[in-house]
Amino acid sequence: MLKQLTEKAIPAFETSFPGCQGLFAFDNAKNHQKYASDTLQSGNLNLTPGGKNTLPMRDGWFKKAGNPVTIHTQCMILHDGHVKGLKIVLEERGLWPTNRKLLTQCTIPGDTPGQRKPNPACKYGSNTDCCAHALLSSQLDFQAQKGELQETLEAAGHMVIFYPSFHYE
C-alpha cells in the first residue's frame, strides 16, 4: 500500500495538480494504521538496554517543568548502539519512581494456576502509572505517533483523513 502511494498515487496527483495540496481519504483498515518500524512504542523496549526483540527508535521528546517550560529531545539509542531500556528513558524524564518498584508490564492471574496474562486495565491505559510500559505509553511523544501512511502523506505536503470504523450488523 505504501509503495503504491509513494510511487504512483502521490506522483500522479502532483503531476495532475501541480502546486496543489491533496486530501487522501482511507477507510480505517488495520494496515492503514500500521506504524513505521522506528516509531515510539513502549512495547518495543525492554526494561534494560538492548535485547533481541528491540528495534531502533526515532528520537523522543518531553517537557520539563520550569519557568519557562522547556522541551527536551531524547535520543533512544545509547552511544554503544543499543536501544535504551524503559528504566533509562523514564529516569531521563524524571519519571522513574524512587520509593517503589515499577514492573515492566502489568499482569494478572491467568486461567490456570501459575499462568499470567496482560492486565486489560494496563493495556487500555486506564492506569498510567501501574507499570513502566503504561507510564511511558502515556507520555505525549508516544501518544502523538501517527501511522506510516499518514506520516508519508504529511511529509509530502498532503493531508489525510480516515473514515470512521463501521461494522454493519
Label each region the model flagged.
Residues M1-E169:
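Short functional hotspots at interaction and active-site rims
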